[in-house]
Design a protein with these regions (language model features):
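C-terminal boundary and immediately downstream tail of ABC-type ATPase nucleotide-binding domains
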Residues: 165-181
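H-loop/switch region of ABC-family ATPase nucleotide-binding domains
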Residues: 134-135
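ABC ATPase NBD coupling module
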Residues: 1-17, 41, 167-168
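Conserved ABC ATPase signature
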Residues: 73-77
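Catalytic Walker B motif of ABC-type/P-loop ATPase nucleotide-binding domains
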Residues: 98-101
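A short, surface-exposed alpha-helical micro-motif characterized by mixed small hydrophobic
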Residues: 140-142
C-alpha cells in the first residue's frame, strides 16, 4: 500500500469493508443470496447458511430471527432489518477495518436506536476497527470511543469523543443538531 502506481491499486480492498449511507440490497435476491452469491462469495449451500447466520447474529439479529429471514426478500424486512443485513453483507467478508458512512442517515429515532445497537454489537463481537463518518453528534457520542473532528476537509483534532465534542463551535453544534434534510 506504500508503493505508488496503477499496478498497486486494490491491495487494501480485501481488508476494508464499507457500508454506504445509501446502501443497496439486491431486491430480487433472498437475504442468503445477498450475503453470499450476490456479492461474489461462493460457498457450498450448507456453509453459506451457517456463515450467514453467524454474520447476521454479529449484526444484531437473534439466532432464530437470523434463520427465519434467510429466505426472505429485502422488501419483506423492516428498514432496520435491511440495514442490519447490509451491515452483515460487509461483515461476512471479515474485514479488518469497517467504514460506516452516515450509518443513521435519515432514519427515524426508533430505527436509529436499533442500528446503533447492531453496530455496537458487531463491533464488540468481531473486535475490529470501525470508522464512522457522521454529522450526528448524538450518535457519535453514543457509539465512538475516539473522534477525529474535521473542518474544511482537514482533521483538526483527534481524541476522546467527549473531549473533542467539547471543542465544537456554537455554529457547528447548531448544524449538527439539525435533522438531516
Amino acid at each position: 500500500m506504500t508503493k505508488p502506481g496503477v499496478d498497486q491499486r486494490g491491495r487494501a480492498k480485501e481488508y476494508i469493508g464499507l457500508l454506504h449511507q445509501e446502501y443497496d440490497l439486491y431486491p430480487h435476491r433472498t437475504v442468503l443470496d445477498n450475503l453470499t452469491d450476490a456479492i461474489g462469495l461462493e460457498f457450498p449451500k450448507e456453509l453459506a447458511m451457517r456463515k450467514a447466520i453467524v454474520t447476521l447474529k454479529m449484526a444484531g439479529f437473534p439466532e432464530e430471527k437470523s434463520k427465519e429471514i434467510l429466505d426472505r426478500m429485502p422488501a419483506q424486512l423492516s428498514e432496520g432489518e435491511r440495514h442490519r443485513v447490509a451491515l452483515a453483507q460487509v461483515l461476512i467478508r471479515e474485514p479488518k477495518i469497517v467504514i460506516l458512512d452516515e450509518p443513521t442517515g435519515t432514519m427515524d429515532p426508533i430505527t436509529k436506536i436499533d442500528v446503533k445497537h447492531s453496530i455496537m454489537h458487531s463491533r464488540d463481537d468481531i473486535d475490529e476497527t470501525f470508522i464512522v463518518v457522521s454529522h450526528d453528534m448524538e450518535f457519535v457520542r453514543d457509539i465512538c470511543d475516539r473522534l477525529a473532528l474535521m473542518r474544511g476537509g482537514k482533521i483538526v483534532e483527534i481524541g476522546k469523543t467527549a473531549d473533542v465534542l467539547a471543542h465544537l463551535t456554537e455554529d457547528e453544534r447548531k448544524v449538527m443538531s439539525q435533522p438531516p434534510a
